[in-house]
């Protein structure tokens, strides 16, 4: 008969000996200390937040434990701003859509199609906005939110682009179909159902968000926040495809009814890359504030600041790569704030953390077209070309 003898890593029977994590002899102590260090390193590696490339929904990033560069103080600025409508223009891949989703998740009193309330408060746990006091936090999850992205309207014909915009409108009506469970006139109920089923008239689609905000107000007893992302995509596309006049008529009607003469509007945030002239689609909109890269108020709200880049690199143990990162991706000065390209930083850290590459790469260069700039430069007169040459040479 053989009996197995119970063996322990720790000599002796006392709890004190086990708690000291020691074995006899100096070499044993060194070995244990090395093991503990390695285990701590492994645990830290396992707990690192994931880098979410191409994920634009704030909720998805938080729910999947993704690395999030905290831009929530932007919400505080929006609350304190007197502007009814704010238009942000920033370069592509600069976090505009992610910020829109973040704004939506903070403000929205979200209700499912079955009429059940959704609690998104946990998404902001530990973020900077939670330290801003009750006056700011009293706005959290208090408003109905209308969310529209226009990026799907990049189509070869007006009919196809219009159909895509109508589809986006229908989806938003479906998302808010719970309002049909509340009090609503028969006429409004019929209009709502027609739009949500894609059977509305052109006039009903053109005024859809003004109508939806009214329906939401009657259900929530709160004015709506309207978020419009990539507002310039259908107009830039239409310009090159030859149906600009048709498209701008529809966009102007949609925007004016929702943003200009709408008594059920609380605030609106619009984002895009280009600054479409106010006379084109914002005629008579006196409550519009345009925030471009030349302003400082929201200068750190889009893109990554140097301190944010340093923090991210340190988190993934890449702090020694800052000089290379700065040389490659520190290409912007928003008024007096140095800004790094976030798309490039995220891809760089992802590749380096997984040892996919040892070198910096031009991640941003093929993400979109600059055709509108090329055309404008080609059509520029001598005075404009002289101004461009001055800028290229570092002048102002």
Where are the predicted features?
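Phosphate-binding site recognition
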Residues: 35-396
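Short, small-residue-biased leader/transition segments that mark boundaries at the very start
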Residues: 25-32
């Amino acid at each position: 008969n053989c009996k197995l003898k119970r063996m322990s890593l720790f000599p002796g029977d006392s709890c004190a000996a086990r708690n000291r994590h020691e074995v006899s002899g100096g070499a044993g102590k060194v070995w244990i200390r090395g093991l503990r260090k390695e285990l701590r390193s492994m645990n830290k590696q396992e707990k690192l937040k994931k880098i979410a490339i191409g994920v634009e929904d704030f909720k998805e990033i938080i729910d999947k434990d993704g690395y999030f560069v905290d831009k929530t103080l932007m919400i505080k600025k929006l609350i304190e701003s007197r502007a009814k409508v704010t238009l942000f223009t920033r370069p592509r891949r600069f976090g505009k859509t992610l910020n829109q989703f973040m704004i939506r998740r903070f403000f929205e009193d979200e209700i499912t199609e079955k009429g059940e309330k959704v609690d998104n408060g946990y998404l902001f746990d530990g973020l900077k906005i939670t330290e801003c006091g009750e006056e700011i936090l009293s706005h959290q999850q208090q408003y109905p939110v209308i969310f529209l992205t226009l990026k799907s309207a990049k189509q070869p014909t007006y009919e196809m682009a219009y159909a895509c915009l109508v589809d986006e409108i229908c989806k938003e009506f479906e998302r808010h179909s719970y309002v049909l469970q509340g009090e609503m006139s028969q006429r409004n109920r019929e209009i709502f159902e027609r739009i949500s089923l894609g059977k509305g008239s052109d006039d009903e689609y053109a005024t859809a968000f003004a109508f939806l905000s009214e329906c939401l107000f009657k259900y929530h007893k709160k004015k709506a926040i309207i978020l419009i992302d990539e507002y310039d995509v259908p107009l830039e596309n239409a310009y090159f495809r030859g149906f600009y006049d048709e498209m701008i008529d529809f966009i102007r009607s949609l925007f004016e009814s929702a943003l200009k003469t709408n008594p059920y509007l609380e605030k609106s945030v619009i984002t895009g890359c280009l600054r479409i002239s106010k006379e084109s689609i914002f005629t008579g909109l006196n409550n519009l504030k345009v925030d471009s890269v030349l302003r400082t108020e929201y200068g750190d709200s889009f893109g990554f600041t140097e301190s944010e880049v340093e923090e991210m690199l340190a988190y993934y143990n890449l702090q020694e790569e800052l000089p290379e990162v700065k040389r490659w991706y520190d290409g912007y000065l928003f008024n007096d704030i140095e800004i790094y390209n976030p798309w490039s930083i995220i891809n760089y850290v992802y590749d380096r953390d997984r040892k996919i590459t040892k070198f910096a790469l031009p991640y941003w260069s093929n993400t979109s077209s600059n055709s509108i700039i090329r055309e404008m430069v080609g059509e520029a007169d001598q005075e404009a070309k002289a101004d461009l040459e001055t800028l290229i040479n570092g002048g102002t």
